[in-house]
Amino acid sequence: MSNPFFKNTGPYDINDLLKLTKLEYQSFEKERIKDIKDLNSSQKGDITFLHSKRYSNLAKSTKASFCITNERLNSFLPASCKIIISDKILLDVAQITKKFYPNSITDDFDDSVEYIENTQFKDKVKYGRNILIGKNVEIGSKCLIGHNSIIEKNISIGDNCSIGSNVIIKNSLIKNNVHILDGCV
């Protein structure tokens, strides 16, 4: 499933990504990396990481082109995956993730929100006072939204859900029959 919340700004040259993480002493032929993903969902053209032996079974079958790992774990990776050795795997992954998804680290307020009275949900949802709804929001049937709540852009809420008062929802896919209590963020 593609990520509905954050925009991928790639592809990037592998050597440019390594410079970001100060791992440029390891150099590879010019190759474009499309995305950073977990071991299980990565494909050719992606970069992944292995930081714990607990994921060794997933590592053996990864389809990623590159993997950031350490000396201790690199033997679990398939021959088709080029190994990038790091002493600080998770920090390097954070730097690369920030490059691919720069808006994933911000906590900016969604300025696309508008009062629910001005949206398509005005007559479809029971709601309290002062409710703000962002763009591209989906809300199922039989839902309730409490006072002073904000549902930011690209949120999907299933059927028969209740959202309490003073709730802020961002970057979420909410299934059916979910109850979010007052004050949750």
What are the language-model segments listed below?
Residues 1-118, 177, 183-184:
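Terminal amphipathic alpha-helical/low-complexity segments used for targeting or macromolecular assembly
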Residues 49, 113-185:
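Structural signal for interior beta-strand "rungs" in well-ordered beta-sheet cores
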